Amino acid sequence: MHKDSNIIDELIFSFAQLPGLGNRSARRIVLYLMQDKEVRIKNLNNQLTSVLNNIMECDYCGNLDIVSICNICKHSERDSSTIAVVESVADLWALERSKVFKGWYHVLGKTLSAVSGNDAVNSLKLPKLLNRIREYKVQEIILATNSTIDGQMTAFFVIDYLKDENLKISKLASGIPLGGELDYLDEGTLLAAFKARQSHDLL
């Protein structure tokens, strides 16, 4: 590649910042797009513009959809007595693909660490979760955070936040490997983790 190809360099750099992609994969993507740029780049641009203009965060759970209340939250056959608390939309989608859970969700958006400040705590949207628990008389909260140090710390924080509520709080079973993320687990592992989930007083 010519040293003066700054625009292409910048595009490769942008793709390389995406999760799971490195410089080599980014270069392959850019070269693929350039092979038929009039069609491929225009199509990609149209799709990204559509996402930018139409996709929004669900007011209730934090999922992504084209409406302010996502299809999961407004689905009449979902079990409104149970909410699974997940770290990210990717984790929510992983559980939906596995079809092991039929309740509602709450997307934290991030996790806490030992050095997290008040801004990080506030970003978890726990007051919104608490309002849903009380309004819909939720009976169980399933902590489906990842099996990482930050994920476990976040789970304990949520437990402490909800300790005065009259509901069951459970955690996915330890069959999930240490450091494991829900988005990478197969359906069988997720199903086993849900079936063998433990009440928080056993943690």
UniProtKB/Swiss-Prot annotation:
Domain Toprim: 81-177
ZnF region ranges: C4-type: 58-73
Biological-process GO terms, alphabetical: DNA recombination; DNA repair
Lineage, opening ranks: Bacteria, Pseudomonadati, Pseudomonadota, Alphaproteobacteria, Rickettsiales
Function of the protein: May play a role in DNA repair. It seems to be involved in an RecBC-independent recombinational process of DNA repair. It may act with RecF and RecO.
Listed name of the protein: Recombination protein RecR
Underlying gene: recR
Annotated family: Belongs to the RecR family.
Alphabetical keyword list: DNA damage, DNA recombination, DNA repair, Metal-binding, Zinc, Zinc-finger
NCBIfam families: recR (TIGR00615)
GO molecular function, one term: zinc ion binding
